[in-house]
């Protein structure tokens, strides 16, 4: 059995710099991975079937991104094998930290390894893009500055602090936020250099705070300890700390009713670290 992580990511900032003729928004965002996430385990099947096993209630099997990713890879590669896929879900649904997209990317990379397809990263990222705009981010597995609708990625080296992530018990509708007439859509474009020097904010945050008091309250609570931000369109919010101890000290002061976790920022995703280790073991 092959077991691999599906790590979370944080959007450390999100600027909306314009709107295209097709209705999509032009974005600038900076993201980094976390050493915390879901976990997928893969076993080959000889009958060609894809079977997802999870304890999550209400998950439609055929429309799940993991199953769609696996079937897409089967179809595009002509692979006759199937797989049993076991999902251990740790990340909140609809939290803006990439749970579904990360799961899909781990399915693509994991099955590429399990089935010995030897597809290149570029090919897998291209397949991932047909599943969702964020999937290539996880396929690439490098902290990056993203532009366009998120498809133009420029790898960056960032500090790797510890983060406290709070998951308000609400699922934010991304479509609803991007359709809000009060959303800022003309933030001046920023260069990577300016951004790394300390610029950047989240244009979606004021809209989400207005519509979702749960997110507003979580930000207010975390702001008592460190500057707090929202990732993507929410609902998760985060603050950074110089070490695990300080982050955990604040986490222990949060209400038990507010789910949270502490994780370290990573410029190379834990998925890629695992795959590199596997490749080294094979070649040894």
Swiss-Prot record:
<dbReference type="GO" id="GO:0019288">
    <property type="term" value="P:isopentenyl diphosphate biosynthetic process, methylerythritol 4-phosphate pathway"/>
</dbReference>
<dbReference type="GO" id="GO:0016114">
    <property type="term" value="P:terpenoid biosynthetic process"/>
</dbReference>
<keyword id="KW-0547">Nucleotide-binding</keyword>
<keyword id="KW-0808">Transferase</keyword>
<protein>
    <recommendedName>
        <fullName>4-diphosphocytidyl-2-C-methyl-D-erythritol kinase</fullName>
        <ecNumber>2.7.1.148</ecNumber>
    </recommendedName>
</protein>
<dbReference type="InterPro" id="IPR014721">
    <property type="entry name" value="Ribsml_uS5_D2-typ_fold_subgr"/>
</dbReference>
<dbReference type="Pfam" id="PF00288">
    <property type="entry name" value="GHMP_kinases_N"/>
</dbReference>
<dbReference type="GO" id="GO:0050515">
    <property type="term" value="F:4-(cytidine 5'-diphospho)-2-C-methyl-D-erythritol kinase activity"/>
</dbReference>
<dbReference type="InterPro" id="IPR006204">
    <property type="entry name" value="GHMP_kinase_N_dom"/>
</dbReference>
<keyword id="KW-0067">ATP-binding</keyword>
<keyword id="KW-0414">Isoprene biosynthesis</keyword>
<dbReference type="InterPro" id="IPR013750">
    <property type="entry name" value="GHMP_kinase_C_dom"/>
</dbReference>
<dbReference type="GO" id="GO:0005524">
    <property type="term" value="F:ATP binding"/>
</dbReference>
<dbReference type="InterPro" id="IPR036554">
    <property type="entry name" value="GHMP_kinase_C_sf"/>
</dbReference>
<keyword id="KW-0418">Kinase</keyword>
<feature type="active site">
    <location>
        <position position="134"/>
    </location>
</feature>
<dbReference type="InterPro" id="IPR020568">
    <property type="entry name" value="Ribosomal_Su5_D2-typ_SF"/>
</dbReference>
<feature type="active site">
    <location>
        <position position="9"/>
    </location>
</feature>
<comment type="function">
    <text>Catalyzes the phosphorylation of the position 2 hydroxy group of 4-diphosphocytidyl-2C-methyl-D-erythritol.</text>
</comment>
<feature type="binding site">
    <location>
        <begin position="92"/>
        <end position="102"/>
    </location>
    <ligand>
        <name>ATP</name>
    </ligand>
</feature>
<comment type="similarity">
    <text>Belongs to the GHMP kinase family. IspE subfamily.</text>
</comment>
<dbReference type="InterPro" id="IPR004424">
    <property type="entry name" value="IspE"/>
</dbReference>
<comment type="pathway">
    <text>Isoprenoid biosynthesis; isopentenyl diphosphate biosynthesis via DXP pathway; isopentenyl diphosphate from 1-deoxy-D-xylulose 5-phosphate: step 3/6.</text>
</comment>
<dbReference type="Pfam" id="PF08544">
    <property type="entry name" value="GHMP_kinases_C"/>
</dbReference>
């Amino acid at each position: 059995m092959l077991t691999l992580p599906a790590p979370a990511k944080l959007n450390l900032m999100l600027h909306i710099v314009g709107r295209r003729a097709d209705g999509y928004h032009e974005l600038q965002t900076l993201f980094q991975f976390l050493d915390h996430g879901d976990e997928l385990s893969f076993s080959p099947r000889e009958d060609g079937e894809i079977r997802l096993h999870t304890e999550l209630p209400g998950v439609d099997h055929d429309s799940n991104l993991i199953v769609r990713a696996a079937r897409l890879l089967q179809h595009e590669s002509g692979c006759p094998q199937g797989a049993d896929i076991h999902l251990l879900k740790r990340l909140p649904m609809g939290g803006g930290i990439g749970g579904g997209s990360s799961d899909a990317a781990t399915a693509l990379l994991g099955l590429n390894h399990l089935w010995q397809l030897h597809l290149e990263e570029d090919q897998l990222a291209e397949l991932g893009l047909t599943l969702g705009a964020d999937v290539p981010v996880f396929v690439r597995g490098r902290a990056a500055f993203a532009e366009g609708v998120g498809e133009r990625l420029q790898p960056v080296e960032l500090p790797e602090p510890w983060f406290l992530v709070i998951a308000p018990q609400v699922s934010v509708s991304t479509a609803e936020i991007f359709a809000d007439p009060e959303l800022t859509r003309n933030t001046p474009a920023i260069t990577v250099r300016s951004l790394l020097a300390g610029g950047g904010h989240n244009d979606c945050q004021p809209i989400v705070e207005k519509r979702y008091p749960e997110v507003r309250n979580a930000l207010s609570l975390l702001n008592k300890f460190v500057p707090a931000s929202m990732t993507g369109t929410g609902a998760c919010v985060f603050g950074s700390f110089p070490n695990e101890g300080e982050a955990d000290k604040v986490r222990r002061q949060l209400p038990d009713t507010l789910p949270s976790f502490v994780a370290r920022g990573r410029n190379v995703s834990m998925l890629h670290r695992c795959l590199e280790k596997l490749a080294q073991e094979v070649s040894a």
